[in-house]
């Protein structure tokens, strides 16, 4: 299990944390930090990558998408979301990542955007 970014309290306390959990050891392990602090990011797994999608920061919503390669233990930038947003639903079907809904402005907002990417 992986935890990607997040926040401690309000939107101005976003994190770059990236951690994995081992149920056998009952322990979290810190991994390479996410490129850029973000709260409300979505995440999925596809093609050997843990993918961090969008998010928000005090200045607005985030459209950037990053993939963490489990083999190389490095982040790389992928194609940005056409519609930057936070709080998205993310799912992988047949290697394609689907990004559903979310908010287009920081705080409580909604979007009907549905987009997909092929990492």
What are these regions (language model features)?
Residues 1-119:
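Kelch-like beta-propeller repeat domains
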């Amino acid at each position: 299990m992986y935890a990607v970014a997040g926040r401690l309290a309000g939107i101005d306390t976003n994190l770059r944390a990236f951690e994995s959990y081992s149920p056998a050891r009952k322990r979290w392990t810190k991994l390479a930090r996410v490129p850029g602090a973000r709260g409300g990011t979505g995440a999925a797994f596809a093609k050997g990558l843990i993918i961090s999608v969008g998010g928000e920061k005090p200045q607005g919503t985030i459209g950037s998408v990053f993939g963490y390669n489990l083999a190389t233990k490095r982040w790389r930038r992928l194609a940005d979301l056409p519609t930057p947003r936070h709080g998205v639903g993310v799912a992988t079907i047949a290697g394609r990542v689907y990004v559903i809904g979310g908010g287009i402005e920081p705080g409580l907002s909604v979007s009907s955007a549905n987009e997909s990417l092929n990492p």
